[in-house]
């Protein structure tokens, strides 16, 4: 139930639920799966496990994009300025490399003087001033995701579709954008190698966004 999921996430975040119990839960999700309602409740509980941003006072509609990543993925660096130049505010928090793929932050940090560690206020100020902000993820946003991801990484449960979807979207929901563009890469060199699995993930993430009252489009 929603109450049970919220209790579990609160316990994981506070440390009241030990790692071995959380790991067993993650393995149960991998083996048994979760339905769309359960996955959405998990995503929302993770999103509200820490601080959340309210961007509505800066702009009524803001967008964010997420790519599941792959070799040579640099879409963020071109898509964000193009969208912002059309007058639609873009507020994005990016991540680092996962496995063998290079993350957006890793690429940006190769530019001398570029800062990715913006404070919450700097993030909001830049969005208000320029209509575009790109920063690293704050540790205060969706802290439950950080704990669960670390456990998934060492327990062989990284590939669970409900856990992947909840991990991606909990951070996005916490960051406050009203609409998302999701880019699910597939094939050799991508995080999701099999197209069938990529399509399943994309449909699940679209459903979660719809059930969370967010506008979304997903490309595979």
Which residues does each predicted region cover?
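General beta-strand structural signal in soluble alpha/beta enzymes
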Residues: 64, 90-94, 116-119, 134-137, ...
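A glycine-rich helix N-cap at a beta->alpha junction
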Residues: 107-133, 202-209, 213
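Alpha-helix C-terminal capping segments
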Residues: 31-32, 78-91, 171-176, 212
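Divalent-metal (Mg2+/Mn2+/Ca2+)-assisted nucleotide/phosphate chemistry catalytic cores
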Residues: 112, 124-193, 197-198
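Glycine/serine-rich anion-binding loops at beta->alpha junctions
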Residues: 61-84, 88-100
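A glycine- and small/hydrophobic-rich beta-loop-beta segment
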Residues: 7, 208-211, 215-220
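Residue-level signal for inorganic ion chemistry
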Residues: 25, 108, 182
């Amino acid at each position: 139930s929603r109450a049970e999921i919220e209790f579990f996430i609160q316990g994981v975040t506070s440390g009241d639920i030990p790692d071995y119990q959380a790991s067993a839960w993650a393995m149960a999700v991998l083996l048994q799966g979760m339905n769309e309602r359960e996955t959405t409740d998990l995503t929302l509980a993770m999103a509200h496990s820490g601080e959340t941003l309210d961007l509505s006072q800066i702009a009524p509609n803001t967008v964010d994009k997420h790519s599941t990543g792959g070799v040579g993925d640099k879409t963020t660096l071109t898509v964000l300025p193009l969208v912002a130049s059309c007058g639609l505010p873009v507020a994005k928090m990016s991540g680092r490399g996962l496995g063998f793929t290079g993350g957006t932050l890793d690429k940006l940090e190769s530019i001398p003087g570029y800062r990715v560690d913006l404070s919450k206020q700097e993030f909001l100020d830049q969005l208000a001033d320029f209509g575009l902000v790109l920063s690293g993820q704050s540790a205060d946003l969706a802290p439950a995701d950080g704990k669960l991801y670390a456990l998934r990484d060492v327990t062989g449960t990284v590939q669970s579709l409900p856990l992947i979807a909840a991990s991606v979207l909990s951070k996005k929901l916490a960051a406050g954008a009203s609409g998302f563009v999701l880019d699910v890469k597939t094939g050799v060199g991508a995080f999701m190698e099999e197209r069938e699995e990529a399509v399943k993930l994309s449909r699940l993430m679209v459903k979660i966004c719809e059930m969370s009252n967010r506008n979304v489009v997903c490309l595979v």
